Amino acid sequence: MDRAIRRNDIDEKALLRKLILEKRRALSDKGRREKSLAIQQRFFLLDEFRQGRVIHLFLSFRGEVMTDGIVKEALALGKQVVVPVVVGGSEGMNLSEIRQYPEEVEPGAYGIPEPKKKFIRRVDPATVDLFVLPGVAFDVRGGRLGYGAGYYDRILGGTVPSRESKRVSLIALAFELQLVDRIPSSVHDVRVHKIITEERVIECMKSGMY
């Protein structure tokens, strides 16, 4: 029975991922820029951003919310900016600091922007105050559907719950079209605390994990 439920969830995730990615690809370049700017403006007002010292930001790829302006502003404010580096294998993904953008960045694995090899400065995930996360789809309870590799579930699941000294904030940037009624999830899936869209800031229901 449990195996059948898991199989159904996997199938549902695959279908949902396909549908939402198609919707996102249909956005015009102009529409994506305008929506991304609105999301950026809302994000800059968050206490989590203003007070955060070490911030993980994803470097936008294909149809994702554009993060260039956020990266530049965070660096200009003197924050330590950390970005993902796909390494494959059991580690899957590491984090690395960048100090100049876009000068230190180039296309990496799968064409995803990441630091050039000579600028890799590995960072412990446990030092990060704020994780700004990408994703394919989200629900208002904080459910997140990623691209299927499980990189963030692994890196956050292994570090966030063990941090007793301070709470790390998990914030997703997404277009309204990426919101769905329910994301199929398991106990290993990481939920976000807030979702920022071009129209609103969603305070997600607290998950049992945090």
Regions found by a protein language model. Give the residues of each.
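N-terminal active-site beta-alpha-beta segment that forms phosphate/nucleotide-binding
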Residues: 2-127
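A structured binding-face within diverse protein domains that lines the active/interaction site
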Residues: 113, 134-136
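Charged helix-capping and loop-helix junction motifs
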Residues: 72, 147-153
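Short beta-strand segments
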Residues: 58-60, 84, 133-134, 172-174
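Surface-exposed, charge/polar-rich loops and edge strands
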Residues: 1-11, 22, 76, 101, ...
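Flexible, active-site-proximal loop/turn residues at the rims of small-molecule/cofactor binding pockets
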Residues: 61, 137, 201
